[in-house]
């Protein structure tokens, strides 16, 4: 029996009341935007917040539970994920509604581009930058994603989240503890929805701002490639892409993974990359930048999962274990 089948059989009675979808041995390469990585023992897609809470209460705390959102800013290693992976469904967590003239309540699984389009139709300004963020709202809330000089934290009023025990928490903007590409409140929580606030603005002005965002992306980013977005955070006082370029890493390839010639802070899967190729490439870039400029780049992409045994002894990746 596979690991997923064994776990499902072990917990069968505990999970019998769930309404969401359980998939054993789910290929993470079908979920992540990199289209690489191993299998999750069990993938759970809850129907709604109540179903997710019931799941979290049913699964013993010693069994790992990992949230992956819509898989955009994520690199999964080749031996996959132990325990459960939770992916919020668009049906239960992907809707948005206007709750006041300038406020929107949106589910964590709504794609950022769809949120921007929804705000446009509602005539609510300040959401145009979401049109330039690859991923979903849950990830944007977790990492304070931003584009075109605007960050998610500037729009957040409150965030709903469940902890590992299935208990509900509601955080104000201040309680989220936002900083550059991070939120202090994100550890161990699954964000389910948020209330966001913009301002009244003419739809044509909003549309023009969104068009400008789209034009910028198409001009400088490899948006039609298999990519997870920005690979590294910008160091203080400089840009990650500049340091990568100065270190001679534009277009650098390892296996099927490449630092995009178009934007060298975007790592792409050219078609055959494994999770190992992608992470090894990223670590090679970090080493070369450190040697060239003394700057230690920090990963912006989240890396999860287990290495295959023949990969874990690699001298570059050994420091990551």
From Swiss-Prot:
Leader peptide range in chain numbering: none
Pathway where this protein functions: Cell wall biogenesis; peptidoglycan biosynthesis
Active-site residues, Swiss-Prot/TrEMBL: 181, 230, 300
Organism: Chelativorans sp. (strain BNC1)
Domain FAD-binding PCMH-type: 36-201
Family to which this protein belongs: Belongs to the MurB family.
Cofactors (names): FAD
Protein name according to UniProt: UDP-N-acetylenolpyruvoylglucosamine reductase
